[in-house]
């Protein structure tokens, strides 16, 4: 009886536990439209309203996944500021809000699930969804 009760209790607790769902591209698109569109443009082509005044021009974000290889770790490091080239004009603005809040387990290509701020993971999902051949 005790074993059955513990099993039932375990099932009930498992059903009650909430797990963070992985962000989908539409969630990331909203973040993109709020933070990235001025430089990278509405379609991610690097042609936003501020792009003409920038040197070098913003990257075409639809071409990040060359040959079907989407470099998740590299893209995250550029967005969050770890990948600074030191070259003038290559800096991304600071996106402090993208680095806060709930985290989700994200595999950036090395097979390791890394706790990643949900907004950052959502933006990554959106960028991956707009890749062109």
Describe every region a protein language model picked out.
Residues 24, 71, 115-119:
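An acidic site on a long C-lobe helix of protein kinase domains
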Residues 1-16:
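Sec-dependent bacterial lipoprotein signal peptides
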Residues 15-31:
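Electrostatic cytochrome c docking/interface patches
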Residues 33, 37, 80-84, 128-132:
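Sec-exported extracytoplasmic/periplasmic mature domains
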Residues 19, 39-46, 97, 128:
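Detector for the c-type heme attachment site
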Residues 28, 32-42, 92, 123, ...:
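The canonical Cys-X-X-Cys-His
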Residues 53-112, 123:
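Extracytoplasmic electron-transfer domains, predominantly the class I c-type cytochrome c fold
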Residues 118-133:
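C-terminal partner/receptor-binding element of secreted or periplasmic proteins
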